A protein has these predicted regions:
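Alpha-helical transmembrane segments and their short interhelical loops
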Residues: 1-46, 97, 101-118
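Flexible, active-site-adjacent loop/turn segments at secondary-structure boundaries
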Residues: 4, 59, 64, 132-135
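Transmembrane helix segments
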Residues: 33, 37-80, 84, 88-89
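Membrane-water interface at transmembrane helix exits
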Residues: 2-3, 32-36, 87, 91, ...
Length: 137
């Protein structure tokens, strides 16, 4: 399809990049859960954040089309980092060095997001228990 060939040597590095990215998603989910617990709403804010991250990831069109002030923000977007790294492995035939550079960028971002998410969820649960409103769900 579309005259694209996948590099078999990129499967394992792409899976490792995906594994480094997954904790970021868990962290976002925990932050979203904490927001819903605390405010009884949050789908609008969560949807906007997901839209902003996805829109600036380069998944739908090249980042070069963005204004110059968006480029620095897009360069630290974990979704964009993961997509670019996996594309390079599967389609571009990039090597292990490129995969390790991508993983080195993703691990701190994923770790920080996961820790923030767990902390936010813990605070939200503590608040709901203290107020006695956990049973409202």
């Amino acid at each position: 399809v579309f005259n694209v060939s996948f590099a078999a040597s990129g499967y394992i590095p792409a899976l490792l990049i995906l594994a480094a990215f997954i904790p970021f998603v868990w962290g976002l989910g925990s932050i979203a859960s904490a927001g819903v617990l605390t405010f009884r709403r949050g789908s609008g804010a969560i949807g906007f954040l997901a839209f902003a991250l996805t829109f600036t990831s380069g998944a739908y069109f090249p980042l070069a089309l963005f204004p110059s002030w968006v480029a620095p923000l897009a360069s630290i977007n974990p979704i964009g980092i993961a997509i670019t790294g996996m594309r390079a492995q599967l389609i571009g035939g990039a090597g292990w060095h490129d995969a390790l550079v991508t993983i080195a960028k993703l691990v701190p971002l994923s770790g920080i997001t996961l820790l923030l998410g767990l902390y936010a969820f813990r605070l939200a649960m503590r608040r709901e228990r203290r107020l006695g409103t956990l049973g409202l769900y």
